[in-house]
Amino acid sequence: MEVNQGEIVGFLGPNGAGKTTSFYMITGLIVPNAGRIFLDDEDITDLPMFKRAQKGVGYLAQEASVFRHMTVEQNIMSVMEMSKQFTKAEREERHEALLDEFNLHKVRKSKGIQLSGGERRRCEIARALAIDPKFILLDEPFAGVDPIAVEDIQYIIAKLKYKNIGVIITDHNVGETLAIIDRAYLLYEGSILQSGTPEDLAADEEVRTKYLGSTFTLKRSAAFLRAEAGGPQRLNTKAEHEAVAPSPQSEPTVPEE
């Protein structure tokens, strides 16, 4: 499996297929029992999570991760203060830019516990981008978000391509996910059943039989159509003898389960 910078790739599949496990292996939350993970031709399989983050692998967990008793601006700034890549002036400038980009100015003084589902997600994504990652993994980004806010989150995710960020997304809301991704890997019982564009998967009879259902209809979201763009570089995952990860000309990998 591989993911390029500047594209959005879905990890799809039924419960127990291996989606979250793959995420955990990429981020370093668990150690794979087979296969290797590479980033920019560097084997990062044995690196701890914080080292992977320093090298450009961001992660947004399925569970709410906003600091509940800190304000929005404190949530974002706290992450940047742990990084030595920005000066104080650069941190302040970047902080204001993120608040503006994610439309968080009105709630900047609000504590995490006071935010709506959509505001919380925007804050979490802004915080994940604070240290300028090459790749970001989004685990269930639409969970706990009301339908009206889903399109806002879709647009934010779709725009990440313009920043040359590689996005890996998994969500049980398959319709909303396929509506914004460039391509996907469909995991089934720990293996890759099929891969391709949303159109390829929607037209595949085996995919419809085992996962999408016979009545599924693919509909691209307005967010995707507005934000459609491209970019270089890759992240990927493979079997033990050929695992790989992203780079301008290289890629990260996660082993099969």
Spell out what each predicted region is.
Residues A89-V107, Q154-A158:
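Conserved ABC ATPase "signature" region
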Residues T27:
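Helix-to-loop junction immediately C-terminal to a conserved catalytic motif
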Residues L12-P14:
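The feature captures the beta-strand-to-loop junction immediately N-terminal to the Walker
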Residues D43-E63, K88-E92, L201-E206:
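ABC ATPase NBD coupling module
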Residues D132:
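Conserved catalytic motifs of ABC-family nucleotide-binding domains
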Residues K111-L115, E119:
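Conserved ABC ATPase signature
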